[in-house]
Amino acid sequence: MRVVEPQEGCALLLGRPLAERGLLLDCVWPVCNRWGAADVEQPWQGAGGRERNFLVDPREQLAAQRWGRDNQRSLLGVAHSHPAGEVRPSSADLRRSEPQRVMLILNGVGDVQSWWLGEDRRARPLPIHVL
């Protein structure tokens, strides 16, 4: 995701639930940031450029979900970068993200934090365990 700095980069997170142990994230699917692209519907106009916003291309998301179904994986959430910001979700991130998903944020100095977005659209820190 850092390759597109100073713009925000994004990726889809795929994996599967583990019985009583949380989620196994075993596929990071890089996608293009389509924020502001003329051929993609923009639900939030006037909110700035790709330096502070991202939008996953719906076609890329469908391709990832198809691959996931074929490989017993499901969409767990989205990763994106805050090149000049903190590793916590912005108010825009919280408004635009689907609830009951993982949100992983990487900043410009390499810090990473994962979050669980609940039904109430509040982000709660989610521990990461590397296997």
Mark where each language-model region is.
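Conserved beta-strand-loop surface patch within small alpha/beta domains used
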Residues: M1-L75, P83-L131
